[in-house]
Amino acid sequence: MSTYTRRTFLQTVAVAGAAATLPPRLRAEMSKDGLFPAGPNFHASARASVMISGGTITKDGKFTDAVRAAHSLHYGARKKILLVLHATEPDKRDADEQKLKLLFADDQYEAESLHHWTGDEALKKIAGAEAFFVGGGETFLLLRTLIETGQLGAIRERVLAGVPYNGSSAGSNVAGTVIGCTNDFPVVDVPTRASIGVLPVVINPHHPPVGAPDYAERERKIKAYLRLNPAETVLGIGNGAVARLHEGKITIEHGPAFYYHGAEQTALPEGLCPELTALVTAPA
């Protein structure tokens, strides 16, 4: 006997109707795996080099010492950085670009923002990029724009080919498998929580340090999330903290950082992180 009820029909119509209001690029992306596909598996590559920070990466008008050291390690000899500022509201992207250009110039990097190009020209900039920096702001706006423009897959392809990825706050969120533990509001709709997926975890930026007034509440929220999503692992990363995937290993370059899985929560020391590295090396 068929289980396709009137309620099922109405739900299908509602979802399809919502999808019909989305731009063509979004609808095309959604149609590949159904209307709202599940999050992807970790997109692994031995060449992937991915750095994330929890936010608040500057002090006194410069990158913090920890972030500067991490940039030097991560970018190496690559001195041209393509900024991806889609998490910023469109009318503020020029100003954000100028701030970041000055910050990077202090450390002898050249930076330019992808938002000056659209369509195929933007995809060409991604294809020729030496390195990426994906800035913070509105995570849902960032993910929607990446999907709508076709840039999500293009950036993922370059990162898996060895182009360094560096994300801060919202830029950290989209490096993970899904945007499941964002701190910001869903200011726009997205067709799926699935993101770039070059880190094998869900990211929670701006994670409070132990003893901070909001630490216990953040821990409670993440554990509640994991009770509903028990297969996932969450990396909480604090302001000014840095984590890095390189050559198949994940290290905490600067804390605080926290590992969550199931009911377990562990404060991670700096250095190699076996718990997270095991996720990189685990069979698909």
Give residue spans per PLM region.
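Catalytic-core regions built around general acid/base machinery
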Residues: T149-G162
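Catalytic nucleophile loop
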Residues: F133-G136, V159-V178
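Portal/gating segments that form or line small-molecule/metal binding sites
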Residues: E89-G137, L141
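Glycine/threonine-rich flexible loop motifs
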Residues: T139-T149
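General beta-strand structural signal in soluble alpha/beta enzymes
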Residues: I52, S113-H115, V134, N166-S168, ...
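N-terminal export signals
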Residues: S2-T3, T8-E29
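C-terminal and late-domain segments of enzyme folds
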Residues: G34-G76, V84, R93-Q98, A131, ...
